[in-house]
Amino acid sequence: QAESSAASDVYKRQFMSSGQICMALKRLYVHRSRYDEVVEGLSAVCNRMVVGDGLLPETNMGPVNNAKQLKTVTDMIGQARASGAEVRECGQVSDEALYRRGYFQKPALVFNPDQSLDIVAEEQFGPALPIMPFDTEDEAIRRANDSRYGLCSSVWTEDRDRALSISRQLEAGYTYLNNHGPTAQDFRGPFGGFKDSGFGRNLGYEGVVQFQGYHS
């Protein structure tokens, strides 16, 4: 079945709070043998979502925070579309007039964009997700690490040993297994990023040490 609990989980990890979470799922690399299945499953989940006033009970996804950030997201989507990548804007709009007037963007899936495009290379911080196929684990790891950012990563597989092997090669401060984001956080572990995602840690023993002063 194309639409699975995994597709629902991936949706939540990227589109929670309209994608406006620092540790949200940024890019999705899928083995080519499962690519079509994941694309269709995730599309089915996204198409059920209702975008609109976040105070209404029928709404699944609210607006982007401000006009500037909305433009950042829509510019990324537009650049990807202009480059020839397929873009699928999913979901339903509860109030068309409000949607046009507000800072709304339906959940957008961008299929196999070039690695150099902003939707892949930069942080979108909004409701858009690039999905790229890969053929080998080495390729997936290389492409995942091909970024100036390195806050969070995740590995999704039923093979725990393979997941651990891959996770040790990812250049990120935190790696989740079959999960992603704040709802999967273990507060006993230090949290922070590599590269341009910052320095230092909070949470865990190491996080406490960051706030200590030393007197010799």
Language-model regions: role of each:
Residues 50, 100, 104-216:
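Conserved C-terminal structural/oligomerization subdomain of aldehyde/semialdehyde dehydrogenase
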Residues 5-114, 177:
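ALDH superfamily catalytic-core signature
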